[in-house]
Amino acid sequence: SGLLQSLDREDNTEARALYLQGYDGNQGYIFDRIMRGKNIRIEAVCLSVLGGIQPGKLKSYIRASVSGGHGDDGLLQRFGLLVWPDNDSKYINVDRWPDTAAKTQAHATFKKLDDLQFNVDEETSAMLPVEYQFSPEAQNLFDDWRVEFETMLRNNEHHPAMESHLSKYRKLIPAIALVCSLADGEQAVSYDSLLRALAWGDYLKSHADR
């Protein structure tokens, strides 16, 4: 909640714009620093936000987004992995050893991702992003899903704020599929990776509906 509150301040509009633009991960960004006499350009902005927020505080941002006020600029919709907790009155004590094998596997995956190599421009020596594509089977699955998804978005059964949120799934689903694919060391995004992403998307939509 501290991050969202800081982005609400009038003197922090530039930071809010950075978070809005950094969602796509394929653009640069210029910080205007007049007092220092120069602008600061970030060639490629890609932001990930990890954290938690109390449901009560989140409600105020949802209301601002739905009402069409100052919060209706698409920032909240960019938090596509948000989940809403269950209110379980029964306490269950969980006391078990950490899964060492899973922790080791996770660290190995993080190391593998950190070692990914960029392409290099032969003339300028500039680093270029590596492009990953769907496998033919995954592409067919994505095309079928996209037709069904776009039809659902156009059925006029959702609030405009919900439509805005769900429209981000056009990027979110391929992004999750790519994460799954990279974690598994695939050369192309496979059918199974996309299938996992679609299942995750169904789960996230159920929480968005809440």
Language-model segments: what does each one mean?
Residues 1-210:
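Phosphate-handling catalytic cores of nucleic-acid transaction enzymes
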